[in-house]
């Protein structure tokens, strides 16, 4: 079952601290202003807070340039990392699996049985045992993926819209901290050494680099990424229509292809990477809405929400991030004919 509280994050934690006499809290250090503000608020109370940056691919001192010299274009960053052969450090070994611990707040929390959350159509069916949360399930999923031939075909399948095998599906466990980017890389390296090293396996590393790059962009620019014009790399005006945003959010636009994506997101909390880009482009370019509203909606819906990846990807699409071409404007008809030529995805959700 899933235990949850509806409360301000810090207020909720402090209630637990007081009730159960907790004297220390351990957490991930995230370079985003809301998360940093939460740390500051917690440190102002009688509880020791220990925050660690451990979700990245590299340690801070491995990055081959000062933060203010971080390239504003991903390709320059990637080439610098690869030319200097910067490699992630090996993750700490997992000596023993952590057994599930019964929550100390069961008597006060609401419970949702997984059977009530069954989404058989989802590309990430959380009601299936192998898609459950937690370190053990995440690590088992990681092992299973790299014990298959899926890594060797990843680049060919990664843009598909349906099914559970077209992409790695690591993101929910990565976003929750159950597995780390360094663990993924360690499995990838072993796969390349013992099975096959090809363009597809490189592309898994390529996507890990994107994730790392967006984390560094957040560290470099801080709150600026949330501004209307983002990083200011485009002078395009930012408009907004509340009416159009509601149509998009509820999956009631003039495009059933877009509606299918928005319904999948709302019903399951998951969406393929390709579809995320398509619906984002549609909101910004066809419906003339503020990209930050779309980013906020994704934040409220995604089971794999990651502040850096989410907001940087939205800014990128809108032309207010790190895209040197000033954003991406997808031709929706072409996207549909390429990725859903027979209308199977559209029929599944609409």
Question: What are these model-derived regions, one by one?
Answer:
Residues 1-89, 94, 263-264, 309, ...:
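Trp/Phe/Arg-rich N-terminal binding region typifying the photolyase-homology
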Residues 4-7, 133-136, 252, 256:
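Conserved phosphate-coordination/catalytic loops
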Residues 16-21, 46-53, 96-110, 321-327:
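Short secondary-structure transition/capping segments
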Residues 70-228, 336-350:
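Glycine/tryptophan-enriched, flexible segments
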């Amino acid at each position: 079952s899933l235990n949850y509280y509806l409360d301000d994050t810090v207020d909720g934690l402090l209630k637990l601290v007081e009730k159960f006499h907790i004297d220390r809290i351990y957490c991930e250090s995230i370079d985003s202003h809301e998360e940093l503000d939460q740390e500051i608020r917690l440190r102002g109370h009688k509880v020791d807070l220990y925050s660690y940056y451990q979700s990245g691919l590299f340690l801070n001192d491995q990055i081959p340039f000062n933060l203010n010299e971080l390239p504003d274009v991903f390709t320059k960053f990637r080439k610098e990392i690869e030319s200097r052969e910067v490699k992630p450090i090996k993750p700490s070994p997992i000596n023993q699996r952590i057994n599930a611990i019964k929550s100390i707040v069961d008597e006060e929390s609401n419970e949702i049985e997984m059977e009530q959350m069954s989404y058989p159509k989802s590309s990430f069916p959380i009601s299936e045992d192998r898609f459950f949360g937690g370190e053990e399930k995440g690590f088992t999923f990681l092992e299973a993926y790299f014990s298959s031939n899926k890594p060797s075909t990843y680049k060919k399948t990664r843009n598909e819209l349906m099914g559970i095998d077209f992409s790695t599906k690591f993101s929910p466990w990565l976003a929750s901290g159950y597995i780390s980017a360094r663990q993924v890389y360690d499995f990838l390296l072993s796969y390349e050494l013992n099975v096959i090293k090809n363009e597809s396996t490189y592309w898994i590393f390529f996507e890990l680099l994107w994730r790392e790059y967006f984390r560094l962009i957040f560290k470099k620019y801080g709150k600026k990424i949330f501004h209307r014009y983002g990083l200011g790399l485009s002078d395009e005006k930012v408009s907004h229509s509340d009416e159009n945003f509601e149509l998009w959010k509820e999956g009631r636009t003039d495009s059933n292809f877009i509606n299918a994506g928005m319904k999948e997101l709302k019903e399951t909390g998951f969406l393929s990477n390709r579809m995320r880009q398509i619906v984002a482009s549609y909101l910004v370019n066809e419906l003339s809405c503020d990209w930050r509203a779309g980013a906020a909606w994704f934040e409220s819906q995604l089971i794999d929400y990651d502040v850096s990846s989410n907001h940087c990807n939205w800014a990128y699409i809108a032309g207010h991030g790190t895209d040197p071409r000033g954003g991406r404007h997808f031709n929706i008809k072409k996207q549909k004919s390429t990725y859903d030529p027979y209308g199977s995805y559209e029929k599944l959700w609409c």
